[in-house]
């Protein structure tokens, strides 16, 4: 994971600074649409601006298809935003790029990445044996 694309609806803009700061501190480069990027920049977090789909190429969908985006956080409202978001989310799914549609989902991803060393992977059979199932 190295590049996080963030584009949020107006009602989520008050929460985006904290979220982008967390991802930046985890080593992510932040890429955002113009409106979201302006909020992020106000908090001294480096951010690269990318075009929305309706603004012409190259845009965020091109970046996802080219393997330039590793994580998508995309909340939307309004007709054009929902249209743009559907192509972003569909492309993320097709390209196997993790996509969350809520700020809370983004916070959960941060938490998992931050605490990844505390997680272990076990076979289901091992858990069954331990629990006597």
Where are these regions (language model features)?
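ATP-dependent carboxylate/acyl-activation modules
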Residues: 1-100, 106-109, 118-133
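Histidine/acidic-residue-rich catalytic or RNA/ligand-binding cores of hydrolases
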Residues: 113
């Amino acid at each position: 994971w190295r590049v996080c694309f963030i584009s949020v609806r107006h009602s989520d803009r008050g929460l985006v600074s904290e979220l982008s700061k967390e991802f930046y501190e985890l080593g992510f480069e932040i890429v955002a649409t113009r409106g979201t990027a302006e909020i992020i920049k106000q908090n001294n977090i480096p951010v690269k601006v990318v075009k929305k789909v309706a603004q012409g190429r190259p845009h965020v969908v091109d970046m996802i298809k080219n393997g330039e985006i590793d994580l998508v956080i995309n909340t939307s409202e309004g007709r054009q935003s929902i249209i743009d978001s559907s192509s972003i989310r569909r492309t993320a799914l097709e390209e196997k790029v993790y996509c969350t549609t809520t700020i809370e989902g983004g916070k959960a991803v941060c938490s998992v990445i931050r605490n990844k060393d505390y997680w272990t992977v076990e076979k289901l059979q091992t858990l069954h044996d331990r629990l006597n199932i």
